[in-house]
Every structure is written in structure tokens, then in C-alpha cells.
Amino acid sequence: MGAGATGRAMDGPRLLLLLLLGVSLGGAKEACPTGLYTHSGECCKACNLGEGVAQPCGANQTVCEPCLDSVTFSDVVSATEPCKPCTECVGLQSMSAPCVEADDAVCRCAYGYYQDETTGRCEACRVCEAGSGLVFSCQDKQNTVCEECPDGTYSDEANHVDPCLPCTVCEDTERQLRECTRWADAECEEIPGRWITRSTPPEGSDSTAPSTQEPEAPPEQDLIASTVAGVVTTVMGSSQPVVTRGTTDNLIPVYCSILAAVVVGLVAYIAFKRWNSCKQNKQGANSRPVNQTPPPEGEKLHSDSGISVDSQSLHDQQPHTQTASGQALKGDGGLYSSLPPAKREEVEKLLNGSAGDTWRHLAGELGYQPEHIDSFTHEACPVRALLASWATQDSATLDALLAALRRIQRADLVESLCSESTATSPV
């Protein structure tokens, strides 16, 4: 009996332990993170970051779908939330971070604006007026914070970026023309005609007393040294002070001398260039062939010997000379610019006396484009402008001009160019 009672006493705690273990296992099995269950009692699963619920659980398990980059996003783990549309930055907003599957876009106001927390709109930053300076800059959701400039500082400009600036302190060699205020800096001026000295105190003296005195003319080397140094020094420990003058008074004559030298040199250079150009033009004019215009028919040519010759009879006596010259002119391949001025004027007159489009056809044969040809019509004499422009080219040979005239059926001009101008030489 005693053993049976003891066994039953041991079964009580065992039964209680088994009961508690079963309850805990049952509770662990029933725990569901989402707190949602299907109709069959299965725990509904949640969609991860970057995924949204396409079909919530009910009769079936939860169906998830990925969010579209730059279109939708999901930044929570949920069994009910679908993908949300991305925020668009509009108006005064600019995008500081793009919209991705797991994060929305981040917008911020443009420079000079901040986002008002109450309205959510971009507002213009506050401007610190003159006499006030920046304490905290305007950015994100914070407006500009300004303060009045304290003593020793100033701000002479209204803006939202600059703090109060420290006032200028005049040097010992300067005098103050205007005090520094909250709105304007101090203004200093160099003291003219004064020497500032600092002497080494005698042995046993505790202080150095600055003094001023009228200047004496220093040697040239000392003046240059004082201009460069600009400070008072003591030579070899002597108690005699070495005085220097402000650099401004000494440098002004130097600057003026340099400026005058530059101006004179520039004027001389321009004059030399113009003289050289005129000289070259004069030499070029002298090297051109002499204008040999034909004298009127029957005019008498006089030589230094006093013998007169009839130009018409001379022309009749020398036909072979003209023929040879014409052949040389026709095929020598020389430049058009080497023709006598009278011959070029004759060609211009013949072209001017022709039909209105003759010179245009010639310009086309010489290689000019229509727009360039039209530009010659603005000149007083289009034909002269055309031939002068063409004569500057390396290809402006007489053969090229003759070939172009033949192509436009102007044999009369070809004959005129190939015929020698009537000229006589003294007998």
C-alpha cells in the first residue's frame, strides 16, 4: 500500500509538467507574425520590402508582386499593403534621391527656397538686411536665421548667405576717415608726408616711444630699400633709428613712369607699322608697268632729238611687232594683275557695255558661287569689284580669263585682250 501511494504521488507532478508542455507547444504553433489567417487556419504570409500585396489572403494564401522601379515602391513588410506610387518632384522642388522599389523619391526645394513644415510648399529664404548677418543658413526645412551685427562687425549688403564681417582696423601709418558701423566698414587713409620711426630704447629703458619728424632726402638706395621693406629697422643694433616712408607715396611716380613708357612705346610701334606699310605700298606701285595708253591716231610723237614720227605710220610699219606681242600675250600664262591699267579698264568697259548678265556668267566661270556674285552688286562698279577680287587669287592668270571668256561666247573680249595697245617708242 505504501509503495502504491508513493507512485500515485509522483504521477501528479508529471502530469502537470506534461500539461504545461503541451500548452506551450500549442501556443508556439498558433503564433502568427501577421495576425491574419486563411479560411483553413493557415497564417497569412507578409510581402517583403520592395513587394506589394497583389491579392490578400483569404481563401488562398497572400499573393505578392514586385514594385516597379521609379513608378511604385513599398517600404514596409506587410500582408495587406500594396505598392504605393512614387512621389513626383514638381514646381520649385528638385529630386535629391530617386524612387526605387523599396524607397520613395526624396524631394527638396531649389536653391534659395526651403520647405515650410506647415504647408509643405517651397518658400523663398529670408534675406538678412544690411546691418544683419547670417547665423543659420536656409536649407531643407529651415529658413534663414539672421542676427544684428554686434560691435566690431558690419554687413553692408542684403543677402541670405553672408555673416557679419569684422571691421577694418586702421594701421599706425593711417588715419580713420569713417568709423565702422553695423551697416558700413571703417575707412582709412594713408597719412601723407610723415615719417614713422621706432627707435631702439637705451639700455635700462622699459618702453619704446614712437615719434614723427619731417623727412630728409634719403639716398636713392635707401629710398628703394624703404619702398620694398615699408617698415622701420635698426642698423647693426645702433640706437639711431632708420626711418622709412609709406610705400604709396614712393610707388606712384614709379607707376606713372611705367605707364608713360608703355604708352610711348605703343605709339612708336603703331607709327613704325604704318610707315612700313606705306613704304611697301609705294614700292609696289613703282614696280608696276608704265601705263602705255595709245595716243590718238595721227598724233606726232616727239623724241629728245626733235624728230617727230606719225603714230599711224609707225603702226603701219610694225604689224609684225603687234602680231608677235599678241601671240605672247595670248599664251604667256602671266597674271591678270600684270596687265597695264589701261588694258584692264578697257576690259571693264566692254563688260559694262554688255548685257546685264554677262559679267555674272563670267563670275560663274571663274569659280564664284551665286551668293558671292550677288555681293558684287552692292559695289559701285560690280565688274571692277569682280575682277579686283579675282586678281588676288593665285590662279588669276590671263589664260584662265581668256578660257572663261571663250566659254561665255565673248570672242570680242578675247580679241581685245590679245591685241596689243598701240604704243610707240622714241626714235
From Swiss-Prot:
Glycosylation sites: N60
Organism: Homo sapiens (Human)
Known function: Low affinity receptor which can bind to NGF, BDNF, NTF3, and NTF4. Forms a heterodimeric receptor with SORCS2 that binds the precursor forms of NGF, BDNF and NTF3 with high affinity, and has much lower affinity for mature NGF and BDNF. Plays an important role in differentiation and survival of specific neuronal populations during development. Can mediate cell survival as well as cell death of neural cells. Plays a role in the inactivation of RHOA.
GO biological process: axon guidance; cellular response to amyloid-beta; central nervous system development; circadian regulation of gene expression; detection of temperature stimulus; dorsal aorta development; extrinsic apoptotic signaling pathway; fibroblast growth factor receptor signaling pathway
Protein name: Tumor necrosis factor receptor superfamily member 16
Main location as per UniProt: membrane
Disulfide bond annotation, renumbered to this chain: C32-C43, C44-C57, C47-C64, C67-C83, C86-C99, C89-C107, C109-C122, C125-C138, C128-C146, C149-C164, C167-C180, C170-C188
PTMs per UniProt: N- and O-glycosylated.
Segments traversing the membrane: 251-272
Keywords: Apoptosis, Biological rhythms, Cell membrane, Cell projection, Cytoplasm, Developmental protein, Differentiation, Disulfide bond, Glycoprotein, Membrane, Neurogenesis, Phosphoprotein, Receptor, Repeat, Signal, Synapse, Transmembrane, Transmembrane helix
First and last residues of every TNFR-Cys repeat: 31-64, 66-107, 108-146, 148-188
Pfam family, one: Death
Signal peptide interval: 1-28
